[in-house]
Amino acid sequence: MKTIYILSIGKLYRGKNGLYFINKDKKKSPIPLESIKEIFILNKVSVTYNALKLLADRNIPIHFFYENTKKGISYYLGSFLPRQKTKSGLVLVKQVEAYKDIEKRTEIALEIVDAIRYNCIKVLEKYHIDEVKELRKIDVWKMFEESLNDWKDAINIIRGIESNIWNLFYQGLDKILKLYKLERRTRRPPKNEANTIVSFANTLLYGVTLTEIYKTHLDPTISFLHELRDTRYSLALDLSENFKPIITFRILIWLVNQGIIKDTHFVKGLNGVLLNEQGKKLVIKEFNKRLDETIKLKSGLKRSMRWYIKAQAYNLERFLLDGRKFKAFRLIY
């Protein structure tokens, strides 16, 4: 099973023998529905009603992204999610209750943030830089307890701890990146080459996480670390966060330090920097490789990174249903 990425302008429609994509040059390509997990549409593509119905019948999500190269703007637009056949009223009730219960919500959010910290260390530790020592000193739970005076401030305190972790991580990254530097994290639009690689890879990771959540009974609109948003499935933001260091930022380090990605792979707009089609293909290739990479952990499991994304979602579901401790994914060999 694979992911389809559509990078060209065109039309997605249902033909006599299945689903097809036709580009602006009238070149027609069949899309084999029996072998795909999801579709990412990364350009201006019209999708017919019959195509959507066919995808809905096969439970195949589509993720849409908007881009304006002149302005240098690119962002997630929305997703088409077929009716969730695994929907559970009980899980929905439990998820809402956990969101409203500040102590439970805090427990989930702290676990995610500590997993972010741990995975940031795993990415940086072989470079022997000071930021690794600083990240190891951070005790997420202790910092939270020492800062908490009122439970209504709990989530903002956790986000502050998370922000400190990411800032240390970014400082460390800039020491090891050979060419393009983050300098500081910028979004919508990303202001430089490193940031645009990160933003693009993060949108892919968000889409994959949403696809995997869709396979569970969880409601993707109800989150714990991120605030609920009308424009995004915020649980996918929560559950992708601790995978960013080991997927997104390893992609950045590899493409930059191996000299794979170059100035010719970027487009500079009025407000920011974007990847051109060839640049996107390089990121997608490395992203797929990271997702399919099998990792054997201390538990003895040898599974793909995509599998661990789904397993984390199921882990959260079990916590909501029967109170088994929620464990966010950590890269523990």
Curated annotation (Swiss-Prot):
Pfam families on file? Cas_Cas1
* Top enzyme category: hydrolase
Q: What is its EC number?
A: 3.1.-.-
Task: Give GO MF terms, alphabetically.
Answer: DNA binding; DNA endonuclease activity; metal ion binding
Q: Name one GO biological process term.
A: maintenance of CRISPR repeat elements
Q: Which residues bind Mn(2+)?
A: 162, 226, 241
Sorted alphabetically, the keyword list is: Antiviral defense, DNA-binding, Endonuclease, Hydrolase, Magnesium, Manganese, Metal-binding, Nuclease
Q: Where are the annotated coiled coils located?
A: none
Cofactor(s) this protein cannot do without: Mg(2+); Mn(2+)
Family, per entry: Belongs to the CRISPR-associated endonuclease Cas1 family.
Q: Which HAMAP family match?
A: Cas1
Q: What does this protein do?
A: CRISPR (clustered regularly interspaced short palindromic repeat), is an adaptive immune system that provides protection against mobile genetic elements (viruses, transposable elements and conjugative plasmids). CRISPR clusters contain spacers, sequences complementary to antecedent mobile elements, and target invading nucleic acids. CRISPR clusters are transcribed and processed into CRISPR RNA (crRNA). Acts as a dsDNA endonuclease. Involved in the integration of spacer DNA into the CRISPR cassette.
User: How is the quaternary structure described?
Assistant: Homodimer, forms a heterotetramer with a Cas2 homodimer.
- Return the protein name: CRISPR-associated endonuclease Cas1
Q: Which organism is it from?
A: Nanoarchaeum equitans (strain Kin4-M)
The gene from which this protein is expressed is cas1
